[in-house]
Structure formats: structure tokens, C-alpha cells
């Protein structure tokens, strides 16, 4: 029994796309490895060359000899022979040996497997049918062959974890002419396979896509579901839930995830789900389907409630039930029946809901994130898939991993890792513990086999994370080897590389990179995407920062008109002031405000009377662009401007507003530190004398009166000043403990060292050393400036 369980687990792993197996049968393990290698060579745009085919045939011969050398029971031997027969037929087909392919495929087709292997047998049958059909002379004959024999092989709706089976169905559907006409398919194929007919009908002709939503088809599918649920009864204690309903639910999961748009689902689906719940006992598939159905219906404001029931909350409750039932199943079987569906549901809930949706004692958003990570680790270890742990994930160039998952599994796993990365991307602890690198390192080998754009985006985020950790040398290598050698026009990668080089004492390399890329972007200006135009603006600002560092502020101020001319050339005249893209929302007003704030900061570098007036003008322009959803971005810089104008009280008001909006606003905290240290420097002796004095009420009133005469007086007395210093200490400690920007900002550590020195604490030297370290590693601009 143990051996049979190990064999089934190996087959389960293979259907998921695994490449390493431990079934206790060496011949089977090696046969599955040959099958994996064949899939690796035939996936995507890859082809099998005669040389590769020769190597694979040699491996097949070795496995066949091994299976003959050691006695195996007939069911296991048949399984191995059928796997190898399919592999040999596919190799012959791929290298143009069609007669040999026909013979080997027929031999494999004649092998009847034990019912124990029915799930894997269906996959092998579909694979065999596809290549057998492809041996026909033209597309019509291929389509006819598939129509005639598909339902001789396809006997049930595969679960999401039977990913290779789904991949075969996609390939078959691509060659079926007119397969997405549901009304015709119902006439051709029998009623007892109706859920399968529905599944075939929603697969579009292009691999990886689904058909568009059709209201007529939706009504047809709903009608079938209603008729089905009306006929069945609640199962007895000795019975399982209705098989046909469970099959229909598997189809609906695919249908509602990929076909039905938000607000398009009929409210009758809600009634169907309620009836299905009343006719089943703790059905994992019903709870899974209910999550998507209720979320889709509940996305419409008018349908957000049905009979007083809040559907958004109802969807979450079904997710809770889905997880509860799945965990019960795991306790019974020591494994999940459909682990990919679990990952899909966790992804869906984490991306569609927030912490505001938490339900006491039932649903916790943060806990769901932890459970997603635990489930991923379990998945990798259970199916012997290489997992990048923290130590091994530091350099993906040193530790490359090659994976070849079926599209659905690859998409689910990559989304899972990116979901974890995106949620934790602003976490300092996740950055310092290398968790962020681990998330991305596990996503990179998956994305490599999927979409080139996803691969480049993931590698870029990996390099950006390295740069944030100040591991700029490795970041530069990753950018060069994995992005720029393949895509020399990836401007954001060049921008990040320039910022990495700018951490070094010699800024010339960074300056040369920026100038070369800006010249290339100028030559290709007409072809730039919306995102690349934003990249152009911020790279121009990086160039000006480098000029300021290398040649001085006056030379930089002379080039400011070029920045505004560039903005006008790129964006003015366009109708859209806001552009929504796959990477987020790009707001032109926010970018223009950034330009004005940068100009303001430049004029403040040389605070003459004229320059301060120019700075005020730039600040007024920036403030005029303020919007509610990014309120107060100008406040820290206006506070610094007020400090230069010796209007300390107004500066403090701006600081308070900024910290109230965001208590981790590093610029505001540093302005606060500047105010406090400036006051202490001016009146150090008075502060020492008055520190322990208590001020009576009359004294406070007198102090208030004096303050009205002197608007720049910030503190009533030394006690008030001490309280402000204590508050600053809390803000600084919080910044270096929780904020990525705060931890790597030298001025934050310098301010902390000043406080530690003032109170003679042992952390003075540590803070000072951190300040020096991060000053030496400071880029010319924030690394995030290239992340557009």
C-alpha cells in the first residue's frame, strides 16, 4: 500500500510539472524524468532536433532495459511502457519520422492501465490522441479525428492540479474547428458529459486564452445547473456528494475565474449556489465556486446585497469554509487533493480583499499571507521542486534553477510569489532578512518559461531589491547578464545601473550611462511608451543631480529649462492627464509636482535673497498641483524653506502636518531634528539652567504672551524642549526599525548619534558608524526613482 501511494504521489507530481520523483520504483522515476525532459524541449517555441531526439531515445532504451531487468508487477510495468511509448511517438513525430510515430503511438494506445491510475491514464490518452490526430494530412482531418475520439478519452473534468491534462486540452481545443459554439457542441456530444462540453467550449483557439463572456451561453449553463441541482438529493451518511454536481463545480471554477467579468453575473447564480449548498455536505468544490460567484456578483454596487446579505462578506465566509474543508481533507489523507486550487484561492482573496475585510475569529488578512507562504513551501518540498532558500537566493546567477511547469501552474506559482513580494516590499525586516530576495528568486525561474515581459520585470525587481540592500555589485551583474544583454533598450534597467554606479566615489560612469541613455531615448522619442516617458523625465532629473554633484548648483540651475521643455514635449497636447497601465497609475500632475519640488530644492542649495524668492515661486507651483490622494507631499520641503527664512514656527506646523499624514515621513522627521538641534545650538546654556525648573500657570501665560511677540520661539522652556527631543528620538528609532528609507538614510543615523551623544549612551558610536557607512553607499537619487 505504501509503494502504491508513493507511485500515485509521483504521478501527481508529474501532472503538476515536477522533474524529480521518489516513487520507490527507479524505472518509473526515470521514465517520468524522460517525460519531463521531453516536455521541456517541446514547450513554448522549442523544438526537438535530431541530436536531442537521439539522446532521448537512448534514455528511453535505458529505462526499458531497467524495467526488464528487475521484476515489476504488471500494472506498474504497463504504466511505464505507456509513458515511454507516448514519449517515443512524440519524438518520432517531432523529428519528422511519421510512420514510426504512428506505430509507437498505437502501441501505447493499446496498453490498458489499471483503474488505480485513471487520472494519469486520461492525461496519457489525451496526449496520445493529440499527436495521433496531428499525423492526419490537413487541419480538417485533424479536427474530425479529435471530435470523433475526444470523449472516448476525456471522461471527467480535471482538477486545477491536473495541469498537464489541462495543457493537453488547450492543445486539442486549438485544433478543433468551431469548438466554441456551445449550442452545436451540445448537439454533437452526449448529455452525461455536459460539464466537459462546457469546459471545451470556453477554451479559445489561442493557447492561454479563454473565450469572451456570452450572455446566451451563461443562461444556457445556468439552466443546466439549476436543472441538475433540482434533481439531486442531500447525500446519506454512507454516500458522497453528487458526482455530476461536483464535476459541474469544477467547470464553474474555471468559468467564473476566467470568463465572467465583474458585474456581469446574473443574481440567479446566487440562488444556484444556495441550492447547491443545501444538497451537499461540506463540499470543497461548492465552497470554492461560491467564493468566486459571490465576489463577482457582489462587485456590482446594486447587487452588493441580496436579501440583506452582503455578498463580499459572504464570499469571504465561503473562503473560510473552503480552507476548513481542505484542512480536514489534509488531516485524513496527509495531502491536499487539489493544491493548485488552494493557491489560486489564496491569491484571489489576498489581491481582492484587504485588512478592512477581516472577520473576528474567522478571517485574518495577515494570517492568510502567512498561510500562503507555508502552502508554497509545502508544495515545493512535497513535490521535490527546487526551492530558493534565503542563503541560496542571494545570487540567481550563481544558483540558476530550471523549471518547466504547465502554464496554469506556472501562472499560479509566479502570482503567489509576486503577491508575497508586493505585500512585503516596503517591509524593512523582509528586506534585511532576505525574504524579498527569496520571493523573487523563486519567481524568476518560473517567469523565464512564461512571458518575457514578466521575466524582465521580475529580474528588475530582484536587482532593485539588491540595490536597496546596497549590494550594488551583484545588482549590476544581474542587470547586465539577465536584462541588458537580451534587451538593450530596457531604459529602467540602465537607470538602475546608473544609480548603482552613483554610490561609488567616482560618479563619471553613472553620468556617462545616463547621458548615453538619454540620447538614445531622444532619438526614439516617437516610439516611447507612456511608462518610458516617465522614465525619461526621472532619468533627466538624475542627470541634473549628477551635474550638481560633479559641477555645482549654479551649472545645474542653468539646465532647468531643459527639464521643463522635455516635460512639455513628452506630455503636453495629450488628452489623458492620468494613464492607467499594467504597472499602476501614472499621474502627470504628480510628475510635474516632482519637477517643481526638485527645482525648489535646487534654489534652496544657495539661499540668496533672489534664490529664496525663486524657491518660493517653485513651491507655489508645486502646491497648486496638490490632490487629495497624494496630499502633503510638499510639506517637508516647505518646512525646510521656512527654516531658511527663519520662520521656525511655521516650519514646525508643516512638519506636524506631514507627520500626522505619515508618521514615517523621513524628510519631515529630519526637518524636525534640524529645528530641535538648531534651537539647542543657539541656547545650549539657557537650556541647561532651566531644564529642571517648574513653570507656574502665570509663567506659562507670560511665556505665551512673549511668544506672540516672538513668532519663532518654539518651546516654552527646557522641559518642553526635552519632551520634543524625546519625541524626535521615538520617531528616529521607529524610522530605523520600520522604514527602508529611514534605515538607509545617513542623516537619520546622524540625528540619532547627536541624541545619544547628548545623553552619553553607548549607542553613539554605532549610530555614527551607520551614518558613515550609508553615506558612502548613498546613491545620487532614491533607487525607487527608476521603478516606473
Curated annotation (Swiss-Prot):
- Gene3D superfamilies for this protein: Tetratricopeptide repeat domain
- Topology in membrane: Peripheral membrane protein
Family matches, as InterPro entries:
Endocytosis_PI4K-reg_protein, TPR-like_helical_dom_sf
Q: Does the keyword Cell membrane apply?
A: yes
GO BP term, pick one: protein localization to plasma membrane
Query: What GO terms fall under cellular component here?
Result: actin cortical patch; cytosol; endosome; plasma membrane
- Alphabetized UniProt keyword annotations: Cell membrane, Endocytosis, Membrane
Location, primary (coarse class): cytoplasm
Location comes to: Cytoplasmic granule; Cell membrane
Entry similarity comment: Belongs to the YPP1 family.
Report the protein's function.
Involved in endocytosis.
Protein name stated in the entry: Cargo-transport protein YPP1
Amino acid at each position: 500500500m505504501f509503494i502504491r501511494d508513493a507511485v500515485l504521489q509521483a504521478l501527481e507530481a508529474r501532472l503538476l510539472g515536477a522533474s524529480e520523483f521518489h516513487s520507490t520504483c527507479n524505472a518509473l522515476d526515470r521514465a517520468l524524468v524522460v517525460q519531463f525532459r521531453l516536455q521541456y524541449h517541446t514547450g513554448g517555441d522549442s523544438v526537438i532536433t535530431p541530436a536531442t531526439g537521439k539522446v532521448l531515445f537512448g534514455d528511453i532504451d535505458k529505462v526499458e532495459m531497467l524495467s526488464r531487468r528487475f521484476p515489476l508487477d504488471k500494472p506498474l510495468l504497463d504504466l511505464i511502457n505507456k509513458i515511454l511509448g507516448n514519449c517515443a511517438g512524440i519524438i518520432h513525430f517531432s523529428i519528422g519520422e511519421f510512420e514510426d510515430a504512428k506505430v509507437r503511438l498505437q502501441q501505447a494506445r493499446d496498453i490498458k492501465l489499471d483503474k488505480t491510475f485513471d487520472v494519469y491514464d486520461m492525461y496519457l490518452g489525451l496526449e496520445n490522441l493529440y499527436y495521433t490526430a496531428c499525423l492526419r494530412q490537413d487541419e480538417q482531418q485533424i479536427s474530425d479525428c479529435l471530435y470523433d475520439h475526444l470523449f472516448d478519452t476525456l471522461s471527467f473534468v480535471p482538477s486545477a492540479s491536473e495541469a498537464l491534462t489541462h495543457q493537453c486540452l488547450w492543445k486539442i481545443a486549438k485544433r478543433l474547428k468551431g469548438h466554441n459554439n456551445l449550442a452545436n457542441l451540445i448537439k454533437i456530444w452526449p448529455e452525461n458529459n455536459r460539464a466537459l462540453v462546457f469546459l471545451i467550449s470556453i477554451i479559445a483557439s489561442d493557447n492561454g486564452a479563454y473565450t469572451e463572456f456570452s450572455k446566451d451561453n451563461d443562461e444556457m449553463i445556468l439552466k443546466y445547473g439549476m436543472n441538475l441541482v433540482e434533481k439531486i438529493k442531500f447525500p446519506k451518511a454512507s454516500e458522497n456528494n453528487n458526482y455530476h454536481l461536483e464535476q459541474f463545480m469544477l467547470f464553474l471554477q474555471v468559468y467564473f475565474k476566467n470568463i465572467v467579468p465583474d458585474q456581469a453575473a446574473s443574481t440567479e447564480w446566487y440562488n444556484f449556489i444556495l441550492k447547491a449548498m443545501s444538497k451537499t455536505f461540506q463540499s470543497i468544490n461548492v465552497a470554492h465556486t461560491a467564493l468566486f460567484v459571490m465576489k463577482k456578483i457582489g462587485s456590482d454596487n446594486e447587487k452588493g446585497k441580496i436579501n440583506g446579505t452582503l455578498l463580499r462578506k459572504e464570499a469571504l465566509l465561503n473562503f473560510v469554509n473552503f480552507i476548513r474543508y481542505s484542512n480536514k481533507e489534509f488531516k485524513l489523507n496527509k495531502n491536499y487533493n487539489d493544491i493548485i486550487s488552494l493557491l489560486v484561492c489564496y491569491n484571489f482573496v489576498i489581491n481582492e480583499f484587504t485588512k478592512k475585510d477581516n472577520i473576528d475569529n474567522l478571517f485574518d488578512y495577515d494570517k492568510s499571507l502567512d498561510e500562503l507562504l507555508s502552502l508554497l513551501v509545502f508544495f515545493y518540498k512535497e513535490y521535490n521542486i527546487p526551492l530558493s532558500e534565503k542563503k541560496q537566493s542571494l545570487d540567481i546567477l550563481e544558483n540558476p534553477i530550471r523549471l518547466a511547469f504547465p502554464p496554469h501552474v506556472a501562472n499560479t506559482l509566479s502570482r503567489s510569489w509576486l503577491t508575497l513580494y508586493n505585500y512585503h516590499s516596503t517591509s524593512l525586516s523582509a528586506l534585511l532578512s532576505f525574504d524579498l530576495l527569496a520571493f523573487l528568486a523563486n519567481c524568476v525561474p518560473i517567469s523565464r518559461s512564461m512571458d518575457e515581459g514578466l521575466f524582465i520585470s521580475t529580474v528588475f525587481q530582484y536587482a532593485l531589491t539588491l540595490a536597496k540592500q546596497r549590494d550594488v555589485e551583484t545588482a549590476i551583474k544581474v542587470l547586465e547578464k539577465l536584462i541588458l544583454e537580451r534587451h538593450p533598450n530596457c531604459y529602467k534597467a540602465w537607470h538602475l545601473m546608473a544609480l548603482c554606479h552613483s554610490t561609488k566615489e567616482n560618479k563619471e560612469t553613472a553620468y556617462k550611462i545616463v547621458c548615453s541613455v538619454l540620447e538614445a531615448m531622444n532619438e526614439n522619442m516617437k516610439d516611447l511608451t507612456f511608462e518610458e516617458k516617465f522614465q525619461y523625465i526621472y532619468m533627466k532629473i538624475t542627470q541634473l543631480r549628477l551635474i550638481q554633484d560633479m559641477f555645482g548648483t549654479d551649472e545645474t540651475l542653468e539646465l532647468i529649462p531643459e527639464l521643463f521643455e522635455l516635460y512639455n514635449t513628452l506630455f503636453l497636447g495629450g488628452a489623458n492627464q492620468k494613464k492607467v497601465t499594467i504597472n499602476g497609475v501614472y499621474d502627470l500632475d504628480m510628475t510635474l509636482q516632482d519637477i517643481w519640488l526638485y527645482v525648489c530644492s535646487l534654489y534652496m542649495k544657495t539661499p540668496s535673497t533672489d534664490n529664496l524668492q525663486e524657491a518660493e515661486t517653485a513651491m507655489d507651483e508645486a502646491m497648486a498641483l496638490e490632490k487629495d490622494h497624494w496630499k502633503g507631499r510638499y510639506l517637508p520641503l516647505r518646512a525646510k524653506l521656512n527654516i531658511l527664512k527663519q520662520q521656525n514656527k511655521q516650519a514646525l506646523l508643516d512638519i506636524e502636518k506631514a507627520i500626522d499624514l505619515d508618521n514615517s515621513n523621513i524628510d519631515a522627521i529630519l526637518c524636525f531634528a534640524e529645528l530641535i538641534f538648531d534651537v539647542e545650538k543657539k541656547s545650549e546654556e539657557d537650556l541647561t539652567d532651566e531644564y529642571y525648573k517648574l513653570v507656574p500657570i502665570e509663567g506659562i501665560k507670560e511665556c505665551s504672551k512673549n511668544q506672540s511677540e516672538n513668532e519663532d520661539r518654539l518651546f516654552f522652556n527646557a522641559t518642553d524642549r526635552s519632551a520634543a527631543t524625546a519625541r524626535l528620538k521615538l520617531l528616529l528609532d521607529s524610522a530605523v526599525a520600520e522604514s527602508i528609507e529611514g534605515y538607509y538614510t545617513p542623516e537619520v543615523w546622524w540625528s540619532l548619534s547627536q541624541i545619544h551623544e547628548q545623553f552619553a549612551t553607548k549607542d553613539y558610536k554605532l549610530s555614527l558608524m551607520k551614518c558613515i557607512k550609508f553615506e558612502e553607499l548613498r546613491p545620487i537619487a532614491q533607487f525607487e526613482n527608476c521603478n516606473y
